[in-house]
């Protein structure tokens, strides 16, 4: 569906950093490779090497910092590196030239995110363009791409839309200036994150770079008829019935007001269940939502089954998924959906399905 949305001429980069937002980078990358994606993006060389070690051969871009001592590994394993400033460009050039190799780079432009990239806004424009031109001519470096990152492309108010367009216009001005000054033609110009991929087709350029959208979350995914990839489930391990006036869990945050049947589920903050959600959310059972009660513990949490007769030990409980959207839980936690998906810890087993069939299981303990 994303391919249909962006059209046949625009390349597709799948962002799989942070273990593919908690979904499993290797498994997601393999699937994207099979489906014909053009590029992957990660945050670090460790993430890139994990993909290479597991048979992922397609181009990989590191968006974050890589120490200069690792340039040889980047070249050896055909990994592309983001260059964010003059100092990094010079470091990478010296290392690559000394090794007699060529490192592919994508140059990052800071157009308003105020994080990484050549600063090109206002009085910094000429200096930024000059620095990018210099990087393009350094020995040992091949400038394959240039990119920027939008700060509010996912916001639809007029002020945010205007800011995104200013960022895009500045990015295009920088590209034109570099092309005119040095005659450089970047094969890959990209700036469209999830929001821009969904809402600004004129900003797709040579390649789009969706993150959260790739996993089917948020209003943009709904607009494109995409479904969430992850369903997080557990089971009820035990039940107890308490009399009125019984306090539950640490800090006595919740006290029963009536005769209450409580279930314990083996999912706590060490697994990714935010402690700030204590007594503020519900988990979904086959008979309906079960309010979470009391303080969420490290390894377990409690749910109220009083109004759900028939729900018992061994029954499945959906923490988030199709019947209990992660967006709702994220709002209750005062955060964003991908903070919740990224937080699902490694001790939570992953089961991968395709067309309803289990294709792989990933467990913390391997026997």
Where are these regions (language model features)?
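C-terminal accessory subdomain/extension
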Residues: 241-367
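Flexible, glycine/charged-enriched surface loops at secondary-structure junctions
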Residues: 9, 183-188, 326-331
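A charged N-terminal "starter" segment
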Residues: 1-80, 86, 94, 102, ...
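C-terminal helical cap(s) of enzyme catalytic domains, especially alpha/beta-barrels
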Residues: 49-55, 220-229, 337
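Active-site loop/helix belt of alpha/beta enzymes
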Residues: 18-35, 90-104, 111-235, 242-243, ...
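Hydrophobic "anchor" residues on beta-strands that sit immediately upstream
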Residues: 13, 104-106, 145, 291
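Residue-level signal for inorganic ion chemistry
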Residues: 51, 146, 236, 314
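A structural signal for short, hydrophobic beta-strand segments that form beta-sheets
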Residues: 62, 236, 292-293
